[in-house]
Amino acid sequence: MSEVLSLEEKKKRIAELNKSFSKKYGESGMVRMGTEVMKVEPISTGILGLDLALGKPMPRGRAVSISGTESSCKTTTALTTIATEMKNNKEAFCYYADVEQALDTDYAESLGVDLSRLVVDSTSVGEEALTKLRDSIASGLYSIAVLDSTNAICASKQEESDITATEMAIRARLLATTYPQLINACGKTNTLLIVIEQIRKKVGVMFGNPESTTVGEAGKFFMTQRIMMRRQTKVEEEGGVAISNEVKCSVIKNKVAPPFRKCDLVCIYGKGFDKITDTANLAIDFDIVQDKGHSYKKGTPEEKKWKSKDEFIKYLSSNEDFYEEIRKATLEKYNNSDQTLIMQDDDDIDRKNAEKEKFEDLAVTSKDNSMISDGSDEFKEGE
């Protein structure tokens, strides 16, 4: 039978045990009770709607994956995050593993990325690219590291083999071996790793979601946050010229805030995400600006009115101080709100309300018929 210890005696023995670990293995990894707290420091994506959907923006020292269909602005999201970090931290350097060899540096610069502080590596051989990425993260010199993308990684065995040869899951096995090393390096150096993934459809799937990433299941478990991005519709000018995409972002995994939140964004070709429209939509959603049906209105401290949503957005874009005021008010309203209900689709909320009403109806019926008297009857889903 184990010895019964008092609280103070337990603290004393834990301190002695930690001291012995420190002597044997060094100070790395040990957290002292009541003296050190492992806090998660967020890095803003620079996209207000996505930051709010994430709850806490992308965390330093962790890995985040961005998956999605083609032209769903995955690379733009990563570059916008880099640009925001460089703007907020003038000493920040970032590393970009351009395995796809498709990075447009002019576009990156137009988004606000300082190319003099961006190191780009275009190695396509998997082992070499991942080794460089791991060592770059482990150096502690970079605030953000990006892998774009896992699907473009070509293992040396594939590169040397005949073009008709097939090797099952070679990329997935390579990444499954590398991910623990990358995550360990991120944690030690407080570096954010952004992994960009493409999605494919499984053959022969009759039920459930046929979509999957092509790098196996291992990566999903190492990610602190997973973002799924889908292109919805393209916006056209008069004459049928496409000028932007509407993109839906879904947070399908989140270890630092509630998951399954969503947001809708607009990405303008050649310019990046439309932050003005994003902020305007959020201000209306949070009732900072009231939708009166025939007009839009903001009350205190100074009343303002606009005849249409487009007029409100145009006013925001031409008044930087007012834009910052609206943005701060939206953030404040978000921080003081019930965050479990916001950033969800109306369909999600309607579905949950319907399920709640159905359960309440069942409970009332059961009570009227005296079917539930001692709790012995279990409610089974589907009955």
Place the predicted regions along the sequence by residue.
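Flexible beta-alpha connector loops of hexameric P-loop NTPases
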Residues: 6, 116-126, 158-174, 206-211, ...
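N-terminal cationic and glycine-rich segments that engage phosphates or anionic surfaces
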Residues: 16-19, 34, 158, 201-206, ...
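Loop/turn-to-beta-strand initiation segments
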Residues: 91-93, 141-144, 188-194
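The Walker A/P-loop phosphate-binding site
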Residues: 3, 7-117, 134-138
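Short amphipathic alpha-helices and their capping/turn segments at secondary-structure boundaries
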Residues: 129-145, 182
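Conserved P-loop NTPase "ATPase switch" module shared by AAA+ and STAND
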Residues: 141-159
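Phosphate-binding/switch region of NTP-binding enzymes
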Residues: 136, 168-286
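Terminal-proximal interaction/regulatory segments of ATP-powered molecular machines
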Residues: 294-383
